[in-house]
Amino acid sequence: MAYERRSRPSGPRKKFFHRRKYCKFCSDSTIKIDYKRPDILHDYITERGKIMPRRITGSCSKHQRELTQAIKRARSIALLPFVVTEGR
């Protein structure tokens, strides 16, 4: 019993335009990464409480490391939650 393979249409594919992500902290030097500012750090955490990766946030590697350290410090002194509790 062999299965029949379905071929894809051989027409032209749509080309997607990927917008270049930029580091918000490199472009605007007035924004500082600080563990005491959870309003800024909250933008880099998912709704589940996980730290967003660099490929999604668009920040450079230097600032991503600083963000990670600041988020972990803010979690340890209870400015940010480790895990977000689900509403019942």
Swiss-Prot record:
Family in the record: Belongs to the bacterial ribosomal protein bS18 family.
Alphabetical GO biological process terms: translation
Reported function: Binds as a heterodimer with protein bS6 to the central domain of the 16S rRNA, where it helps stabilize the platform of the 30S subunit.
InterPro entries tied to this protein: Ribosomal_bS18, Ribosomal_bS18_CS, Ribosomal_bS18_sf
Any one GO cellular component localisation term in the record: cytosolic small ribosomal subunit
Keywords (A to Z) from UniProt: Ribonucleoprotein, Ribosomal protein, RNA-binding, rRNA-binding
Entry keyword annotation includes RNA-binding: yes
Entries under PANTHER family matching the protein: 30S RIBOSOMAL PROTEIN S18, SMALL RIBOSOMAL SUBUNIT PROTEIN BS18M
GO molecular function: small ribosomal subunit rRNA binding; structural constituent of ribosome
Quaternary organization: Part of the 30S ribosomal subunit. Forms a tight heterodimer with protein bS6.
Protein known as: Small ribosomal subunit protein bS18
Pfam families listed in its UniProt record: Ribosomal_S18
Gene it is expressed from: rpsR
